[in-house]
Each structure stands twice: as structure tokens, then as C-alpha cells.
């Protein structure tokens, strides 16, 4: 049986400093109210020591001004870490994908750029393989309880439902889907289990559940409904929570997960 994966998320914004703009690790609540909590590279090293299976690095600014900072941050991480890195934020072109892979990314995370230009998924998958392509899908629960896809940091609604967009991504060669509940993000109330439970029957792709973890049991619940991995940012920013402790709880629940290097 394939082992479940535990993935800390490293989301950063840009902060001015006397030495110039620098990346600052932040946590969010429902994709808003960013709170700075440290340095992304330093935190990545801590997560590696705590047995993270992978790391997701995301530039929340996603602009042409922040792009060089994302590349520099990625270079610093890849030079000092052995943990696989999935990287995204503002990717709109194949050239940007190439730059990230050249700097040490193992996978690229496509979001708004893929919705606006779905052919980008085909191009990256055909060039580098499906295993390189993670599609990040941000969703909100609508009044009729359906889930719809939002882009631009959760500020723009699209015409895509979660299931129709997930199927389109799968048909184009995506290798994995990162599903984030905007409603649950940073609340600690638990994952959107219904979406993951239904989606596992819609697409034959590994699913990463994200948004809402506040207890180790929330990770267990995500795995039990079909997630191959659970990603979290705010949860691991708490002093009494880390990937090593969390995976022990997951193993005690009877789920297969790595416990040592």
C-alpha cells in the first residue's frame, strides 16, 4: 500500500526592507488577513528535519516583481534541502516553468495560469511528464452546496465546477490535484471532506487535501476519505505541532506513513 504523504505549505509575501524586498512566510485565514511568521528557507529546513515528505512553496504575490524573489528563494532551498519541492505562484508561461525546474523545483504548481490557458497543462505534461504537474484548485462552497473554482487568490469566480475542472485537468495530463477549501483555510475546523470524498470517484489522480487542518485527526480524516496527501500551513505554524508528531498520530490511527528517514 502506498504511504500517505504529509506536506507543509510555505506561502510567502514580499516585505520591504532596507536591503530591498524579501520573502516573508505568512499564514492566512480564508485567503485573507495574512500574518507574517518567519523566513521560508529557515522554516523549510526545520520541516525537513521533522520528516516532511514534500514541501509546497507558493508566492502569494504572483507578480512580475515578485518572480525574481521566488526564483532566488527556490535556489536557496534546493541548494540546502533534499526534500522534494513543488513550486507555484503566478506561473503563466512555459518559460516560467522551465526557470523553476532549472532552479531545483521537482514539480510545478499551476493555478490561475492554467485556468486562463489550459493548454499550458498539456505543454508542461508533454514536455516533462505528468508527474511534474500539480494543479492547484481553490474552491468555495456555493449556496446550493456545490463547489466552484476561484482564481486570483480566491478573488475571482470562474465558470468551472470543481469536478468539471478536475476532469479537464486530468484529460490534459495533470499528475496530481491540490484541492484547497477557501472557506476552511486557516480556520482549524477541518478539511472539506465531502469534496475529496466525491472527487476520488471523479478522477483517477492523486489528491492533496488542504485548507482547515487544526488537529492531527483532521489529517487522518482526509486520508480516510481518499486523499493521498494532506498539505497544511497554519497548523504547522503552531509551536506544539510539527510533521513528526503529526505522522505518529497518523500511524497510530492505522494508516501507512513514513516514520523515519
UniProtKB/Swiss-Prot annotation:
It catalyses: 5-[(5-phospho-1-deoxy-D-ribulos-1-ylimino)methylamino]-1-(5-phospho-beta-D-ribosyl)imidazole-4-carboxamide + L-glutamine = D-erythro-1-(imidazol-4-yl)glycerol 3-phosphate + 5-amino-1-(5-phospho-beta-D-ribosyl)imidazole-4-carboxamide + L-glutamate + H(+). It is an enzyme of class 4 (lyase). Disulfide bonds: none annotated. SUPFAM superfamilies: Ribulose-phoshate binding barrel (SSF51366). It comes from the Bacteria. Its main location: cytoplasm. Pathway: Amino-acid biosynthesis; L-histidine biosynthesis; L-histidine from 5-phospho-alpha-D-ribose 1-diphosphate: step 5/9. The keyword RNA-binding does not apply. Keywords: Amino-acid biosynthesis, Cytoplasm, Histidine biosynthesis, Lyase. The active site is at residue 138. CDD domains: HisF. One of its GO terms (biological process) is L-histidine biosynthetic process. The keyword Signal does not apply. Heterodimer of HisH and HisF. This is Putative imidazole glycerol phosphate synthase subunit hisF2. It comes from Prochlorococcus marinus (strain MIT 9313). The lineage of its organism: Bacteria, Bacillati, Cyanobacteriota, Cyanophyceae, Synechococcales. The gene is hisF2.
Amino acid at each position: 500500500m502506498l504511504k500517505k504523504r504529509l506536506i507543509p505549505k510555505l506561502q510567502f509575501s514580499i516585505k520591504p526592507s532596507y536591503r530591498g524586498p524579501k520573502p516573508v512566510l505568512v499564514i492566512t485565514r480564508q485567503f485573507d488577513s495574512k500574518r507574517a511568521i518567519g523566513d521560508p528557507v529557515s522554516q523549510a529546513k526545520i520541516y525537513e528535519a521533522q520528516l516532511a515528505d514534500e514541501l509546497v512553496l507558493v508566492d502569494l504575490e504572483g507578480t512580475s516583481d515578485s518572480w525574481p524573489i521566488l526564483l532566488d528563494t527556490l535556489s536557496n532551498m534546493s541548494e540546502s534541502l533534499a526534500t522534494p519541492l513543488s513550486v507555484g505562484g503566478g506561473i503563466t508561461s512555459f518559460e516560467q516553468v522551465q526557470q523553476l525546474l532549472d532552479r531545483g523545483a521537482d514539480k510545478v504548481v499551476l493555478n490561475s495560469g492554467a485556468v486562463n490557458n489550459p493548454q499550458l497543462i498539456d505543454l508542461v505534461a508533454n514536455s516533462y511528464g505528468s508527474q511534474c504537474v500539480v494543479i492547484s484548485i481553490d474552491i468555495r462552497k456555493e449556496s446550493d452546496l456545490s463547489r466552484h473554482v476561484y482564481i486570483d487568490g480566491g478573488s475571482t469566480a470562474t465558470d468551472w465546477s470543481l469536478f468539471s475542472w478536475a476532469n479537464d485537468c486530468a484529460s490534459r495530463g495533470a499528475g496530481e490535484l491540490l484541492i484547497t477549501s477557501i472557506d476552511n483555510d486557516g480556520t482549524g475546523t477541518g478539511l472539506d471532506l465531502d469534496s475529496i470524498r466525491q472527487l476520488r470517484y471523479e478522477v483517477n489522480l492523486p489528491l492533496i487535501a488542504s485548507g482547515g487542518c487544526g488537529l492531527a485527526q483532521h489529517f487522518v480524516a482526509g486520508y480516510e476519505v481518499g486523499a493521498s496527501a494532506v498539505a497544511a500551513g497554519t497548523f504547522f505554524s503552531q509551536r506544539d505541532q510539527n510533521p513528526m508528531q503529526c505522522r505518529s498520530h497518523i500511524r497510530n490511527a492505522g494508516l501507512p506513513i513514513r516514520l523515519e528517514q
